[in-house]
Amino acid sequence: MLLSEQFYQTEKTGYLNEQFRLFHLKDQTRKEFSYHYHDFHKVVIFISGKAAYHIEGKAYQLKPWDILLVNRHAIHRPEIDPSVPYERFILWIQNDIPWQELLKCFQKANDRSYNLVRLNSALQEKMKDILFELENSAKSDEYGREILTQSLFLQFMVYLNRIFLEKQYIFDKKSYTFDSQIASILQYINHNLKEDLSVETLSARYYVSKYLSLIHI
């Protein structure tokens, strides 16, 4: 197993002051993302490009309009092919929102150790419509913008929970690969964020060299 300091240097990134926030991003970069985590929940909606998403030891190979559920404190990173533009929606959600039942999908993803929501064409169109309406409402300055934006966010999350909790998504074992040792290391880090997580400590605990290059899972 090849691990490096970059693997161990998991850090908290991003700050969220609102109940939720939506981003629509498109870029093309050679940046390599390190493992990191957030204090809030995150939904990633992959639109186009070539990308894999690593979450807690699983690497999901993404198809257009795949949705990923990233629980707060879950250690993760995207792996992007820089040869083509990478487009996605990112939805950040506070853990203390008034609608706690809408966070069930994140807990269930954690319980199942499975984070991918791959939709059939009908559900895909439904979710796309709500998502684009949500984006347009959030950017507008029309009357009732905040109420409509909140309503569309709630719609999106209700349908997302229905789809995931009721297993209406397409399950494909070939959509991900799994590395049990990396999963074990990440789980240890995730549950001991306030402890000594130095490269030396983790290397000794898991019998891996701190001098070797980053493994791609």
List the model feature ranges, each with a label.
Residues 1-67, 74, 82, 99-111:
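Generic protein-terminus/edge-of-domain signal
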Residues 47, 161, 190, 194:
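Short, locally clustered residues in the helix-turn-helix/winged-helix DNA-binding domain
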Residues 73-98:
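Ligand-binding loop in jelly-roll beta-barrel domains
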Residues 106-155, 159, 187:
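Amphipathic alpha-helical segments enriched in hydrophobic/aromatic residues interleaved with Lys/Arg
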Residues 144, 148, 167-174:
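Hydrophobic/aromatic-rich alpha-helical bundle segments in the mid-to-C-terminal region
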Residues 157-170:
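Linker/hinge segments immediately adjacent to helix-turn-helix/homeobox DNA-binding domains
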Residues 177-185:
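N-terminal positioning helix adjacent to the helix-turn-helix/winged-helix DNA-binding module
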Residues 188-217:
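Basic/polar phosphate-binding segments, predominantly the helix-turn-helix DNA-binding elements
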